[in-house]
């Protein structure tokens, strides 16, 4: 039993304020020898469960059928809007050169000003010759290809290209202004990290926000029940930031590590349950199944990235026996 418990929540995530953008920001990328985009994005459709053969070598149920909860993420193809080349400086990574495509969708004009010039890829190659160390692409989603998300404005984000700089640049230039599908980025059975903005809960009190204990009947008689018993000592003459208080709860960017991508599907109707996913509907394009839950509500943008600290566990290979498509409406 824990005797000292001033709060249940972690102070590591303070200040608990709303995320700056609903498009999550990825600040670190793992090294990769394969020339490909190291991340992708999709929209959360809902959850279901699958029956699969347990392929973890040291698992007690190895070789047996197990039921695994999965999240369904619809992943329409993404388009490459620009190629960026970065160089290392004493102030961190800085853009050495940038080239935008002139073959972009009109819907992107609602998000940013579209370029009019022809792309000049020679300055990208010159930047690499001058010591640039990393290649990234500016990509955007195509929500107008799906029906579960009621918007047409794309979400713009940046992804790193793996491999050495020369090969990564050639690959990025070949994809400029073209589509990239999720099957070109990830393989079935891959270990990934999931980054998203959590469900927003609004302004909540300290009991729900921090899990502090409610006060006893003596305090309740003076209408003081769901609050903190003490704001701190007389000295210092201010309330410390560690004191659990009311405030914003939810709508924070969070990263969940080491999820397993167990299926990449082309036909969305094969995974759509009877009656469609609640508050989402029918899946129209490509989709992926990710083990466990992911942050955020239905329709939330979910970013996926190569696992930055993958587990040492060994997996034989994904073998799915059954995918549940029963109605999620409770009937």
Swiss-Prot record:
Keywords: Ribonucleoprotein, Ribosomal protein, RNA-binding, rRNA-binding. It comes from the Archaea. It holds the Pfam family Ribosomal_L3. Coiled coil: none annotated. GO terms for cellular component: cytosolic large ribosomal subunit. InterPro entries: L3_arc_euk, Ribosomal_L3_dom_3_arc_sf, Ribosomal_uL3, Ribosomal_uL3_arc, Ribosomal_uL3_CS, Transl_B-barrel_sf. The keyword Signal does not apply. Belongs to the universal ribosomal protein uL3 family. Part of the 50S ribosomal subunit. Forms a cluster with proteins L14 and L24e. This is Large ribosomal subunit protein uL3. It comes from Archaeoglobus fulgidus (strain ATCC 49558 / DSM 4304 / JCM 9628 / NBRC 100126 / VC-16).
């Amino acid at each position: 039993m824990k005797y000292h418990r001033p709060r249940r929540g972690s102070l590591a995530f303070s200040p608990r304020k709303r995320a700056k953008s609903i498009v999550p920001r990825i600040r670190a990328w793992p090294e990769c020898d394969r020339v490909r985009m190291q991340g992708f994005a999709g929209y959360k459709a809902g959850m279901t469960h699958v029956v699969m053969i347990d392929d973890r070598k040291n698992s007690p149920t190895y070789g047996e059928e197990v039921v695994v909860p999965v999240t369904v993420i619809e992943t329409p193809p993404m388009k490459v809007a620009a190629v960026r080349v970065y160089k290392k400086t004493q102030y961190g990574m800085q853009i050495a050169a940038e080239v935008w495509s002139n073959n972009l969708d009109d819907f992107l004009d609602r998000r940013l000003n579209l370029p009019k010039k022809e792309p000049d890829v020679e300055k990208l190659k010159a930047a690499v010759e001058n010591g640039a160390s990393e290649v990234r692409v500016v990509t955007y989603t195509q929500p107008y290809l799906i029906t579960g998300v009621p918007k047409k404005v794309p979400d713009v984000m940046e992804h790193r290209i793996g491999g050495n700089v020369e090969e990564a640049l050639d690959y990025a230039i070949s994809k400029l202004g073209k589509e990239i599908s999720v099957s070109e980025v990830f393989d079935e059975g891959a270990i990934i990290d999931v980054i998203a903005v959590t469900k927003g809960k609004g302004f909540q009190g300290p009991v729900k926000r921090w899990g502090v204990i409610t006060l006893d009947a003596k305090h309740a008689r003076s209408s003081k029940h769901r609050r903190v018993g003490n704001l701190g000592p007389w000295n210092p003459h201010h309330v410390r930031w560690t004191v659990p208080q009311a405030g914003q709860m939810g709508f924070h960017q969070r990263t969940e590590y080491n999820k397993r991508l167990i299926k990449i599907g082309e036909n969305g109707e094969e995974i759509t349950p009877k009656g469609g996913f609640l508050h989402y509907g029918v899946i129209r394009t490509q989709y992926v199944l990710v083990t466990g839950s992911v942050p955020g509500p239905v329709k939330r943008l979910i970013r996926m990235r190569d696992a930055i600290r993958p587990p040492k566990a060994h997996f034989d290979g994904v073998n799915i026996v059954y995918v549940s498509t029963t109605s999620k409406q409770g009937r």
